[in-house]
Amino acid sequence: MSPKPPSDSATEMVQVVLPNDANPLGFILGGSVMHLVDIAGAIAAHRHTRSLVVTAAVDELQFLHPIKVGDLIILKARVTCTFQTSLETQVDVYSEETLTGEKKLTSRAFLTFVAVTEDGQRLRVPPLLVETEEERQVQAAARVRREERLKRRATPRA
């Protein structure tokens, strides 16, 4: 399987925040953002694997700033690291004020997807071809998140 660069899976989604996705204060619902984050991450994972993917984990999702009705919500996703049958994606969410064009980072999430066949069997994923120092740092951070996630899974809960 040939390695693929992160640029092969880079994904950008844009849509207008409408009232049906907002709370009474006129800001997009956190659940609506989470739904879009999952879709953007899955598209990036699918582009990298060229297979079906399922969401296995959301390691981190931060809401830094609200997005108001009428603004654009922009989601940028990319694969950060690959493992045997899974991969991590990073999804950055931005708001864009439609009249001024001002953009602001509003959320960031890290999701793990597993590549599967139509009958749910795991598939090996192509390695990620990291070419820049920034990509190496992002990949190293993803490996740390994975180790932490696996430790949490192995710890019995009360």
Each PLM stretch: what is its role?
Residues V14, V33, A57-E60:
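Residue-level recognition of specific faces of alpha-helices
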Residues Q15-D21:
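A short small-residue
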